[in-house]
Amino acid sequence: MDNIFVPSNIYMVRTPIFSIELYNQFLKSDNIDYDLILQNDIFKESIMTTTYNLYQSIGKIDWEKDNKKTRNVKESLLKYLIRMSTRSTPYGMLSGVALGEFSENNNIKIKDSSFHKKDVKIDGQWLYKLVHYLESDYTYYKDSFVIWNQQNYIYNNRLYLDNNSSITENKRNDVLSVKYNSILVFIHENSKKNITYEELVQLISSKYSIENKEEVKVFVQELINKEIIFSDLRPTLENKNPLDYIINSLNPKNSLVGTLINISNEITKYSKMPLGKGEYKYLDIVNLMSQLFVSKNYLQIDTYIDYSRNELKQSLADNISEAAYILWLLSPNHFGTKTIRNYHEFFMDKYGFEQLVNLKQLLSDINGFGYPKKDSYSFSNNIAFLKEKYLLAIQNNSHIEITENDVKNLEKNNTVSKINAPVSTEIYSEIYFGNSIKGYEDFAVISPILGSFNAGATFGRFTGNFNIKKKNQLQKEIVHHYNNYMNENGLEISQLNEGPLNSRNVNILNNNRIYNTCLNLNLPKSDIDINDIFIGATFNKLYLYSEKHDSRIVFVSNSMFNYEFGSELYKFLREISFEKTKFIQPITEEGIDSLPFCPRIIYKNIILKPATWKINSEMFSETENWLNRFATIREKWHIPKDVIIAFGDNRLLLNLLNDKHLIILKKELKKHGRIRILESFINESNNERMLEIVTPLYKKTSLKEQSFIIPKNRNKHFNNLKDWFSIHLSIPKTYQDNFIQDYLLPFITELKVNNFINKFFYIKFKEDEDFIKLRLLREDEDYSQIYSFIKNWKDYCLLNSELYDYSIVDYVPEVYRYGGPHVIEDIENFFMYDSLLSINIIQSEFKIPKEFIVAISIDFLLDYLEINKSEKEEILINNAEDLYRSNDIREYKNLLAKLTNPKNDYEILKKEFPNLHEFLFNKISILENLKKTLQKSLYTSRSRIIGSFIHMRCNRIFGINPEKEKFVLSIFNEITKTKKYWDGCD
């Protein structure tokens, strides 16, 4: 196995506060003594700090009664007890975390809960209520610094803002638009000088001779309310004690400061209390905080587990990293997100390779594309050998085992470059001790939620209170690895933070600063300015460029925040940053996933996927006893007695012989319509407690990505260009070729014959729908002369063809993409030549597939333009990701070499394919002129321009079809290689 990942030396262990013994001895019983359990102070405080309403209900319940309210409270407490003894995911005092280290032996000894520590800070919801209050009163923010919101977009003397945080409590969904007047310009300029709000009010009053400063304060407050400006009273997400930060930022004379200091002191006292001893102190703090602001949540609590030893075998780490590599090989071959891939196509069509576009301009609805439209999609794989193993496992009542030979075959058949594997990642796995798997004394179960996008993300919010030595060791590893990655590729890594749309997400977004720079959206202290960020494109991806650093920039998150819940800008930056990355995903095999049962899938002592059963409400009828029906299902599918039910991100261990547990399952099934049941390993191990570890992994090879030249050009509007008449013709892709032959070509011919136009060209395109872009040019640019003619033709097509819509749009020439304003007219002449050639190829029949005809035409074009060998190689590098289907090309290689031999004006081509020969030489003077044009000084390299010609020719003939285009380039590559050794002459 050529494993590309190496594990960290450090892991995070996550474990529930109680041991498995609680579940086994008490929670399987039908008669749980809740009075006895509630005498446990840790349990009581845990309930209070996570679900206060449930805590309040406890004192009002008569446990002897059997009414609905009592049953509901008992059920809720049971679920909490199960979670606190069997689920490791950190949450309040229910479970906690610690750092461990891989070594020679397994040795985990968790201390008694009295040694564990709490880390307590104010909850994000209450925090942002406080910040909103402070930013709403000049008295509090007058001494703070003025911060201009870098997301403000200024265009045509107007200011636009399309993102706002939850601090303002502004539910605005539409784009803010205000006039960018002289006062806003003045504020913008002065905000760069680190001035306070008090100084700003004075400056505005003096500049505009406003005697009444209260008027200025009201105006400034309106700007804050709209988040055009804000203050540095906002704590950054890397601040470990946001309340103390605010206290230290305020004038100590403010009356509120004393109250905040009191709350802070009480929180400190509460943090130092042993678990289970802080019930009344917590209530006192909540009372103090609620007197200021009422909130659903007041405090965020994380628990740190103390231990005497925390070590696991290095061999376990190595096998986990191998399992991650196998999962990567088995993951669907999709890169990044489909949303960004679609956006890349739009970008390429308008801007091409050879210019950078300012980020805010590109995302503007006013003069850019706006944000990408979300595309719902799901991916699964068709893995033949898994299907075979599935059938054998079912037949033999066993599991699916992936062997070393299977891995070798996966590697052999892998078509994705290791360059596209994640630079780093994290894998979540439950750890069990015991010899359940032959030959091993331990085993790991990969979590259904595999891990994170990058090493350190899961650790982010916790790192402030970890073991210092281990924490520093981990951060040193991450920084070293990413420094290597940055140096290999000449790029900058920056940490991305955001004041979120939902204030509760602050708790997840809190993190630790690792990288040299950060971009803080809606927050102060940002090292990166959005105005400095540009977007560029290669043939297969978009990338971000920092003008300040003169390099590509990649944004990473050091938290487990789901970027889907971020602002549109946050999502866009994250999605582009992992564009062209194939991530590790859970095993999804389209054939097996559709079945109600999947056996365990295992590699060595790593369970890649536990045995899984799918239950849905349609399996039950109202006339049949539910418990009897479930018993039948359980017997039929051999579902064990102890299982984990999974619904969404939630998981709960249940015993299927216990009626109370079955009631929980029944309710969840009714609520969600379907649930998954996973096998549990609680009875197959000798664990004293549930253990889950987070293992950071680093890619040890293939860090160097394909290099490319970042263009110097910045997108701008050019004057004095020809004014073309541009039409979009909406027509389904399957009918476009017929439409071009039967309607478009006769129309163009008539326009030309009557001297209504001088030039034309067309492009096939797809946005929300398929359409054809038609461009027409008159030298006098007076299109009123032909409008009625065009309208009549359009009406005729609407009645008689598959054309169903029509629009007149602006045409913006891709000046940078094709060499500059001084050559664009000659390039547009070539577009007409290429359009005529493409139409002729579309409407003609050939004795070889049209991909080969197009490849021949491309070879002809490059030879005629005298494109040299190195430029041809560059064209292939820039435009073809991986050349393929060589077996399909082999039988034509000799014929292709003959047909592309230029001897005697391509006499062999003329003999074998006379029509194609005629098409290529029709209007050959345009190519003669183009050859001279491409000798000039150009904004863009010749190879890039030719690459765009090739792309557009494939587009005109095949439509948007990357696979056909890739095949055409593969054929062209084979022609080039063959002609190195044989010119096609017998």
Swiss-Prot record:
The keyword Nucleotide-binding appears for this protein: no
Pfam family name, one: Lant_dehydr_N
InterPro entries hit by this protein: Lant_deHydtase_N, Thiopep_bacteriocin_synth_dom
Keywords: Cell membrane, Membrane, Plasmid
Primary localisation category: membrane
Superkingdom classification of source: Bacteria
Compartments where found: Cell membrane
CC annotations in GO: plasma membrane
Functional description taken from the UniProt entry: Involved in the post-translational modification of the lantibiotic epidermin.
Protein family membership: To B.subtilis SpaB and L.lactis NisB.
Name used for this protein in its record: Epidermin biosynthesis protein EpiB
Lineage of source species: Bacteria, Bacillati, Bacillota, Bacilli, Bacillales
